[in-house]
């Protein structure tokens, strides 16, 4: 009986200890649940507050970025305005530099200006020695110069010369061969006329006599080409292919065209010379 009691008592003790443990383990759970419930409400408030704060920070950063962008744009526009002002408004140094360049340029141009003044004086001097030979010529600047007896050689042939621009022209109405006209021009320290360009050709055709006149263009058999008497260059564009050298090796001028013919024929002589080639 005693062993059974001990055994029984042992079993009861063991069960009671388990019950006590169960009771002990169950007792602290209630305050934990209460504690969790107590702390869960403030944590949600903190999260909401942090979210609002982050949103405000994002809005602030966005506003700052927009402000900085606008400021940079305004600064860029201001810089462009200043650059344009600097480029468009000459500074004092630029003005001084331009003045210096103008002074240097005027010094460089003085020889040319002196030459132009000299030519102008020569032209005025030649014009002062001339007289108008026709009413129509008054609008063209054409003037006739009286021919001396020595120049006319007493033959009474009509002669006149006129200056236009930088060139002077001498018309000798005494008909001569091409070689005779060349010699006549050389006696007067002139040369048979060389036409420099198309404008001069048209001008001479309007004022030339109705008769054909010899000019200083002839065919060179050695060069196989048409050359001017002084071998100088000319900007006059000539279609030399249309001139058949069998018709003649010397060129003449009429009111309508240039034409080649027999050099032994007798035509009017046209001499010419530039004003800057006359002796002072």
Curated annotation (Swiss-Prot):
Top-level taxon: Eukaryota
Q: Does the keyword ATP-binding apply?
A: no
Listed as disulfide-bonded, the cysteine pairs are 163-168, 181-269, 185-271, 250-263
Localization, per the record, is: Membrane
Instruction: Specify the protein's topology with respect to the membrane.
Output: Single-pass type II membrane protein
Instruction: Enumerate the Extracellular topological stretches.
Output: 67-280
Domain C-type lectin stretches: 156-275
Keywords annotated in UniProt: Cell adhesion, Disulfide bond, Glycoprotein, Lectin, Membrane, Receptor, Signal-anchor, Transmembrane, Transmembrane helix
Q: Name one GO biological process term.
A: cell adhesion
Pfam families from the UniProt entry: Lectin_C, Ly49
Q: Which GO terms describe its cellular component?
A: external side of plasma membrane; plasma membrane
UniProt GO molecular function: carbohydrate binding
Q: Which residues are glycosylated?
A: 104, 239
Q: Which SUPFAM superfamilies match?
A: C-type lectin-like
Q: How does it assemble?
A: Homodimer; disulfide-linked.
Summary of the function given for this chain in its UniProt record: Receptor on natural killer (NK) cells for class I MHC.
Instruction: Report the protein name in the record.
Output: Killer cell lectin-like receptor 7
Q: Which organism is it from?
A: Mus musculus
